[in-house]
Amino acid sequence: MEVLLRANADFIFFREHKTPNSVRAAVAIYWIALSVFVVRFGLALRTLPFSAHRAPMITVFGLLFTVLIFEAFAIAQLSYGKLWARNVVLFSTAFAIVTTVYSLFANGLHSEQNDVVGLISVAAETVAGLFLLTAKSTAWFKSKIK
């Protein structure tokens, strides 16, 4: 006896074909930037002295991990057209821009590869944020409000 199983798996980030290309590009850029941040953080972690107190370090890492999970969730919700996710991601992009500009004026640009990659990542996030603010993207997000 043969049993036929029917399963429909949908692994596509964009369920609709109506998603503007600017939103698709912005989501891809944000995923890449988040991945680059995780790698940069891992590389910077190697330079920390582990003789320091562990309780504050665990607290900071736990808080950062929570923020990263929420950021990943917000990026995933962008592809579904959630306006709140767009606002959260735009706010985090603005925060990254402000902190990067402050760091550049306070410390200057170091020639370390990790700093240059971070600057390029923030520039890419800025472009992605501008993609989310185009007229087509804004109209698409507003059309998703129920």
Pin down the residues of each PLM region.
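Topology signature of small-to-medium multi-pass alpha-helical membrane proteins
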Residues: M1-K146
